[in-house]
Regions:
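Positively charged, small/polar-rich N-terminal and surface patches that mediate targeting and assembly
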Residues: 59-62, 244-246
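Charge-rich, low-complexity amphipathic helices
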Residues: 73-80, 86, 243, 247, ...
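C-terminal helix-loop subdomains that flank or include functional centers
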Residues: 99, 107, 261-391
């Protein structure tokens, strides 16, 4: 692959920042969103810092990975403008690391709204590095080396823009994670309450009635209750009484229901349906429908990648010298392999029809060998052939 020279790099100039791991609530969510939408001086770093804290939710991660990884694993094809497969260029790009990095940045625009990154060479191999979203203002076209500072670079006016430096997505879009933030915050609240309930469940409150006007007796009573622990005995004054109050009567269903509701909403937002592991009383038909809805979203993601490659990536790679001719990035059409296999086996039963073994291997991954015709000496007589046998 021909290596061209690059004038400026932007990722190494970004100042690293320590993100405070404080507890987030709905107020943080609304404040960050208001700063994002500020018309005079928009600041995006509080919003993306908030997304970095909620994206660690395991259920949310699993839903995003189910959709994104299935899209990234799809094989692609490079064709010329006439629709003919360019096998050499396809094989070359399939072995390049930057393909995965670029496609991931494109897909992340579905969840984050926007991605800005740059190509670079590392040990002679082309890579694609994402510029932290906290440091980018795509509405005005700015890159901030320090997102808390006002010093900026107008990246769309740089000569690297459109070749080394490329962007995807919508400048004003919050992405799908916007609707996920409240449910992750509610879920964390429910988890915290449920954890606290587990600590005190089954432990009844202890009540000591004493003379509150006597500070000595109050202090002695407090010390006794603190030191009592799980002991089965204690000493009190004859004027004091000790008893157990009514303990916790709930088993935490209200918290579990809230967590389940939040998980279901996260599944609906990312996958378009509540799939298998999230349902208690599902059915085969429902699961097939849910998987079909998820597949529709994956097909939409594949279409997004195709459009971005053909309008943005390939023109940039032509400037860099990676692609030297007109090309089209595409995915093979989706096929129902179960239905196709059934049709193939039925077609093979017809006389004078032969299914290509090479096509079977490429489509289904099955090694097929042609059956050698039996020799005349190995042919067995059939009673139905008696008319031809007797002369």
């Amino acid at each position: 692959m021909t290596q061209t020279k690059k004038a400026n790099s932007y990722v190494p100039t970004i100042a690293p920042k320590t993100i405070s791991q404080t507890r987030q609530d709905i107020k943080n969510y609304t404040d960050a969103k208001n700063m994002f939408l500020n018309a005079d001086n928009p600041k995006r770093y509080p919003w993306y810092n908030l997304l970095d804290t909620i994206i660690v939710d395991l259920h949310l991660q699993s839903q995003i990975n189910n959709r994104m990884l299935k899209t990234l694993s799809q094989p692609f094809l490079i064709k010329d403008l006439k629709g003919n497969l360019d096998q050499d260029l396809t094989s070359l790009l399939q072995n390049e690391k930057f393909i995965y990095q670029v496609n991931k940045a494109i897909l992340q625009t579905v969840y984050y709204g926007h991605s800005l990154g740059e190509f670079d060479y590392v040990n002679g191999r082309l890579v694609f590095n994402l510029i932290p979203r906290q440091n980018v203002d795509p509405v005005n076209g700015y890159i901030f080396k320090d997102y808390t500072d006002d010093k900026k670079i107008e990246y769309r006016l740089q000569k690297e823009y459109g070749s080394w430096l490329i962007e995807f997505g919508n400048n004003k879009d919050f992405g799908l994670l916007d609707g996920c933030v409240p449910h992750v915050l509610f879920k964390r609240f429910a988890q915290s309450c449920y954890s606290e309930l587990c600590e005190i469940y089954g432990i009844p409150p202890r009540v000591l009635k004493t003379n509150t006007q006597d500070r000595t007796m109050v202090a002695r009573g407090e010390k006794m209750l603190k030191d009592m622990g799980s002991a089965a005995w204690f000493i009190i004054d004859e004027n004091e009484t000790f008893e157990f109050a009514q303990g916790v009567s709930t088993n935490g269903d209200v918290y579990k229901n809230l967590m389940q509701f939040c998980n279901n909403e996260l599944s609906m937002g990312i996958s378009g349906a509540v799939v298998g592991q999230d349902t208690k009383n599902g059915s085969n038909g429902k699961e097939k429908t849910s998987i079909g809805i998820l597949q529709d979203l994956i097909d939409s993601d594949l279409s997004l990648i195709e459009q971005t490659w053909n309008t943005t990536i390939i023109p940039a790679l032509k400037v860099l010298g990676v692609v030297t001719k007109d090309a089209v990035y595409t995915y093979p059409p989706a096929e129902d392999l179960d239905k196709l296999w059934k049709m193939t086996t039925e077609a093979d039963k017809f006389k004078n029809i032969e299914v290509d073994p090479v096509w079977i291997k490429d489509t289904f991954g099955i090694e097929v060998k042609e059956v050698k015709p039996q020799s005349a000496s190995g042919t067995k007589l059939n009673i139905e052939d008696y008319e031809r046998f007797f002369v």
